[in-house]
Amino acid sequence: MSGFTEGNAVSFEGGVFSPYLTTRLPSWAGVRQNVVGSNVDGRPVAPANSTTLTYATIGSSVDTAAAAAASAAASTARGMAADFGLYNQLAASRLREEDALSVVLTRLEELSQQLQDMSAKMALLNPPANTS
């Protein structure tokens, strides 16, 4: 691909191959219509307003779907292995939060017991009036 400028305009000659499936966007999204795009492998993709939205695939659709799922799983596993420290931090943070919650619950039990003791003492000091 080559480009040149004329005044304030820039012109390009040749093909532009994008790794993004922009031709799958609807017409109202501002995407040029009737333009053949390409998928991430460089295979042609019919335009979004085409009557046949198909990919040029080599294998069957089941094989293609299985390969895509395997690729996604491998990518996720690699990401998890690379960011394992992040998961350890999250686990440690959760343990700290559980410890703090345990302290709060213990304190709440102590306060409840003190309230019951005070209520019992108040009941002894002020016997209920007999309304019979």
UniProtKB/Swiss-Prot annotation:
Induction: Expressed in the intermediate phase of the viral replicative cycle.
A single GO cellular-component term on record: host cell nucleus
Cell compartments where the protein resides: Virion; Host nucleus
Keywords: Capsid decoration protein, Capsid protein, Coiled coil, Host nucleus, Host-virus interaction, Virion, Virus entry into host cell
UniProt-listed GO biological process terms: symbiont entry into host cell
GO terms of molecular function: hexon binding
InterPro entries found in the cross-reference section: Hexon_assoc_IX (IPR005641)
Coiled-coil ranges from the UniProt annotation: 101-121
Family note: Belongs to the adenoviridae hexon-interlacing protein family.
Family annotation (HAMAP family): ADV_CAP9 (MF_04050)
Domain notes for this protein: Three N-terminal domains of hexon-interlacing protein form triskelions between hexon capsomers.
Leftover remarks: This protein is only encoded by mastadenoviruses, and may therefore play a role in mammals tropism.
Functional summary from the UniProt entry: Structural component of the virion that acts as a cement protein on the capsid exterior and forms triskelion structures consisting of three molecules that stabilize three hexon trimers at the center of each icosahedral facet and fixes the peripentonal hexons. Dispensable for assembly. During virus entry, recruits the anterograde motor kinesin-1 to the capsid docked at the nuclear pore complex thereby subjecting the docked capsid to a pulling force.
Subunit annotation: Homotrimer. Interacts with hexon protein; this interaction tethers the hexons together. Self-interacts with adjacent proteins. Interacts with kinesin light chain KLC1; this interaction leads to capsid disruption at the nuclear pore complex during virus entry into host cell.
Name this protein carries in UniProt: Hexon-interlacing protein
Upper classification of the organism: Viruses, Varidnaviria, Bamfordvirae, Preplasmiviricota, Tectiliviricetes
